[in-house]
Amino acid sequence: MGFYEGDDNDANTKAFNDKYIKDQKFATAPFWNLFPKLRDIDEYDNPLLPLPFNFNFRDLGDSALAMASGIPTVKQFDKCEELKGQSAWTTQGIWKCLVPSKAIPPLPQLDFLLPLEEIKSDKSHSHGLFFNDFNLFLKWRSHMNRLQKQRIKTRSTAVEPLARTPEDLMLNWDDLHLGNDAEYASADGSKKIVGRAQSISTTKDSNDAKPSTVKTEKIYFDDGTVDITTTTTSKGSSPQVKHKVVSVDEDN
């Protein structure tokens, strides 16, 4: 079913969580935490927000208040009760009302209303993961936070042993961000990048007054291979580029 039941080892839930981290770059807090908790308002109230300009939160749409606070307005909840719906939350902590089929058709065109049976029968979570208890949502967020930290640590560890000194090797941590796997892959898509490293050094031949700069770029793949490109430049000469692919064990 489309509901989270507290079992993170469930095959469908694990598959959803893994894809969610990769595709959406899971954050440690939902974006609506940036907003203050809003009191219940009716259509004539103006929410008081600490903004330096006149702002009406209702202008953002029918579910804006639910997005900001994780709870529905009284008006939204009354509509949900009228339709015999049940409360649920999305992975972003946004409140939704899941309405049984007996209220359909017609289902009012309100963006906080969703068909209950369609969500319950969604075993593969193609419509997303839903929580019928806010405590379960918080439990899932906590699990995902730990999972992301574990993934980052695992990938960082795979690169760290290859470093010589901070001066010799500069890790490009932007490319290690969790969730970028789909972007960083080999041309044929057969393997994924798990890390990058770069080093720049300057050498000077005793017989030549012209110094040379050697830039080495390494790309680490999930199959244990390393793509190495070395570019040597010196003043007055064309850059010399060498490229090779070796195993991690052969990389030195």
UniProtKB/Swiss-Prot annotation:
What InterPro entries does the record point to?
Answer: Mpm1
Q: Where is this region: Disordered?
A: 230-252
> Where is this protein localized, as stated in its record?
Mitochondrion membrane
Membrane topology term reads: Peripheral membrane protein
Superkingdom in the source lineage: Eukaryota
- Any one cellular-component term (Gene Ontology): mitochondrial membrane
One Pfam family assigned to this protein is MPM1
Keywords, A to Z, come to:
Membrane, Mitochondrion
Any miscellaneous information on file?
A: Present with 3390 molecules/cell in log phase SD medium.
Under what name is this protein listed?
Mitochondrial peculiar membrane protein 1
Question: Which species does the entry assign this protein to?
Answer: Saccharomyces cerevisiae (strain ATCC 204508 / S288c)
Q: State which gene encodes it.
A: MPM1
